[in-house]
């Protein structure tokens, strides 16, 4: 939509790259709006049960990824988006629950395997895209960590752990992840204070201490930060870059008695 974004993604990407930065894009391609060219042309591409009113999430329906033609559509469209935008980073998100477990392309006796076929279709799409764009850093996400599993990690080297970025909550979340996954796949960010989910106020140093035990990022409005906070972030990033190989790939030990009562987290 060049009315909203003059020059389109290509123009925006060009400006970002000219600043010496890399360009990332956040996509959520598994849904379809009923007020769209795709739905008007192919209403059968949506996951609905014939004769019933479909469940909608944010006025959207799911695309039926059990169908090969839908998979091909997503591969083609995302290839165009990534090519035009010259993306360096892609966050692949999925923010609604499954509903209306039914495919108009499956016979009645196979409707029970709909969810399994859907995930196999998703794997085909992201396998094709990650092979076409080996230089793009892909990060998986599904309302946080709802797809944090070994299947997605076959195609994407890191996954967003949770939409809850509160430092105390994240300490427990990331500790739990550490029993099954290495730190190098764990997306962890320093976010605003007070925290958006819990309204808890936590010092920047403490937020960094937890977020650096994974793949570090910052999701703050830089214009809201003081000169002192920006200087502190610069030092944190410098420290992380110096030690990130150990933080991501070193041997990880947990302190005994972690969060026994939730009052003295380590």
Predicted regions and their residues:
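Glycine-rich tight-turn/loop motif centered on a GG-T
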Residues: 1-6, 44-50, 104-118
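An active-site-proximal structural segment forming one wall of the substrate-binding cleft
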Residues: 63-93, 129
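Short, solvent-exposed turn/loop segments enriched in Gly/Ser/Thr/Pro and often Arg
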Residues: 27-33, 92-99, 142-147
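Hydrophobic faces of well-ordered beta-strands that scaffold small-molecule active sites
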Residues: 23-27, 90-92, 139-140, 218
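Aromatic- and glycine-enriched glycan-recognition loops and surfaces
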Residues: 1-40, 72-76, 117-127
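Glycan-recognition surfaces
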Residues: 33-72, 116-224
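Glycan-recognition and catalytic regions of carbohydrate-active enzymes
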Residues: 219-266
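Short, well-ordered coil/turn segments that N-cap beta-strands
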Residues: 19-23, 86-88, 133-136
């Amino acid at each position: 939509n060049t009315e909203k974004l003059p020059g389109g993604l290509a123009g925006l990407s060009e400006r970002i790259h000219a600043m010496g930065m890399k360009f990332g894009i956040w996509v959520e391609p598994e849904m379809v709006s009923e007020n769209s060219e795709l739905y008007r042309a192919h209403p059968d591409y949506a996951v609905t049960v014939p004769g019933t009113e479909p469940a909608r999430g944010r006025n959207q329906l799911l695309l039926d990824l059990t169908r090969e033609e839908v998979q091909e559509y997503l591969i083609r469209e995302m290839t165009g988006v990534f090519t035009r935008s010259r993306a360096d980073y892609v966050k692949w998100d999925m923010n609604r629950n499954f509903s209306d477990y039914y495919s108009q392309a499956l016979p009645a006796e196979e409707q029970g395997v709909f969810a399994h076929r859907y995930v196999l279709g998703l794997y085909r799409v992201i396998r094709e895209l990650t092979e076409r764009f080996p230089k793009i850093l892909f990060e998986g996400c599904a309302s946080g960590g709802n797809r944090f599993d070994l299947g997605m990690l076959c195609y994407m080297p890191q996954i967003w752990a949770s939409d809850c970025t509160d430092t105390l909550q994240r300490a427990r979340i990331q500790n739990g992840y550490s029993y099954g996954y290495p730190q190098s796949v764990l997306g962890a960010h320093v976010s605003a204070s007070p925290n958006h989910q819990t309204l808890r106020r936590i010092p920047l140093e403490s937020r960094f201490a937890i977020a650096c035990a994974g793949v570090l990022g910052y999701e703050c409005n830089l214009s809201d930060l003081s000169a002192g906070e920006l200087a502190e972030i610069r030092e944190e990033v410098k420290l992380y870059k110096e030690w990130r190989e150990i933080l991501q790939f070193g041997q990880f030990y947990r302190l005994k008695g972690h969060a026994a009562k939730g009052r003295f987290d380590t």
